[in-house]
Amino acid sequence: MNEIAKPAFLNSDYKLVWHDEFDGNEINPDKWSFNSAMSAKSVLNTENKENARIENGKLVLENHRIDDSGSKCRYSTATSLTTYDTMNYRFGYVEMSAKIPFLYGGPWPSFWTKSIGGIRPRTNKDYMVEVDIFEVFSSPNHLAYTLHK
């Protein structure tokens, strides 16, 4: 296992309250659920397990191009996982180690957090907060992070 340096801001008051080391053979349904509500015009998010798997201690998320011969449209299937029902906290920090593809016209990898008030079921949007820790827009030179209120 590669050693990753601890962030400088961590102190002894922090306690690990949620983690997944992906050491099993399949995605743990007690920690993760598929989210088919996220989509884009040419991407159909799916709960198809062919798009997500555990491999060598890593979560692998894929998208698959749908070959529609003769069509000018390009569609693909992707997957979106959420911890909505298993990881809700008011304070703290989150971290992830990831290998991100930079493919033009391909996937849109992202790592978001959302407040409970802004997602299923849609409650008062005035209280919704979304933090885009990162979003990759198919360019090796562009990485976005945003706070939405």
What does each model-identified segment do?
Residues M1-K149:
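GH16 jelly-roll
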